[in-house]
A protein has these predicted regions:
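Short amphipathic alpha-helical/adjacent loop interface patches that line ligand
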Residues: 16, 38, 69, 216
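PLP-dependent aminotransferase class I/II
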Residues: 7, 70, 82-86, 91, ...
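Conserved coil-to-alpha-helix start sites within the AMP-binding
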Residues: 39-45
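Hydrophobic/aromatic ligand-binding patch that stacks against planar heteroaromatic rings
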Residues: 47-48, 101, 193
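Hydrophobic residues in well-ordered beta-strands that form the structural core
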Residues: 30, 36, 57, 109-111, ...
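Active-site phosphate-binding strand-loop segment of PLP-dependent enzymes
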Residues: 63-145, 150-152, 156-157
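Phosphate-binding glycine-rich loop
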Residues: 1-33, 47-51, 57-59, 124
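Aromatic/hydrophobic pocket-lining residues that form π-stacking "cages" and hydrophobic walls in ligand
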Residues: 22, 44, 98, 162
């Protein structure tokens, strides 16, 4: 929460759990459609299928491998309930255009930022100013808790709903005798051991991000003049 600047953030057992919660908060139900991308790890789309919704793949921009917002606009219909964008390999999607689509069609955009902790768009950290953003803390991510993730939401209401759904629908600030479960929840909470690992890892985040950026620049520099190799085109304002 402190790093991203979003007080409505909560830790979960895995980034996949964070995506599932985001889809439920967005109101995705069986029979709905969710626009997504094939350029991602399997859980992005299998989690959509787990809600009973149909996955609709938008086109990928061949210059950067990211979901093309203009393709997405053409796929929206009365069954479309949400759009899932993936900031693949830390490269941020064209959120200016996706936010415009969200406004025009009143459809929420869910940001899969499993690869993008620390990435920015227009000077703002991803997750600081959007309705739903999920992050992964799995073993090979920038920060790891061995396995884990967290969800950032845009308001107190969604935060409270996610907090209850994260733990069987129970409010852990109350005793079991005081609880009255209103919605079914899950065992999606992060345990104290993995959380402690994550807190220590956060001390080194800037150093780790710097190393990733340095490695990326190294590859770009040494691959750019090789015949048949095309480098990715980074998004503007990222």
């Amino acid at each position: 929460s402190k790093f991203i600047g979003n007080p409505f953030s909560l830790a979960v057992h895995a980034g996949t759990d964070a995506l599932h919660l985001a889809l439920l908060l967005a109101g995705v139900k069986p029979g709905d459609e969710v626009i997504s991308t094939a350029m991602t790890a399997e859980p992005t789309n299998t989690t959509i299928a787990m809600t009973g919704a149909r996955v609709v793949w938008g086109d990928v921009n061949p210059r950067n491998g990211l979901l093309d917002p203009f393709s997405v606009r053409s796929l929206i219909n009365e069954r479309t309930k949400a759009i899932v964008v993936v900031h693949y390999a830390g490269m941020v999607c064209d959120m200016e255009e996706f936010n415009r689509i969200a406004h025009d069609f009143k459809i929420p955009v869910i940001e899969d930022a499993a690869h993008a902790l620390g990435a920015k768009f227009n000077g703002q950290l991803i997750g600081s100013n959007s309705p739903y953003t999920l992050f992964s803390l799995q073993a090979i991510k920038h920060v790891t808790t061995v396995d884990g993730g967290f969800l950032c939401v845009g308001n107190q209401k969604d935060y409270e709903k996610a907090r209850l759904k994260r733990w069987f629908g129970l409010d852990k600030t109350k005793s079991r005798l005081e609880n009255d479960i209103q919605e079914v929840g899950f065992k999606y909470g992060m345990n104290n051991v993995t959380a402690t690992i994550g807190l220590v890892q956060m001390r080194y985040l800037e150093e780790v991000l710097g190393r990733f950026i340095s490695n990326g620049k190294y590859y770009d520099e040494h691959l750019k003049n090789i015949s048949g190799v095309e480098l990715v085109e980074y998004s503007k304002n990222t």
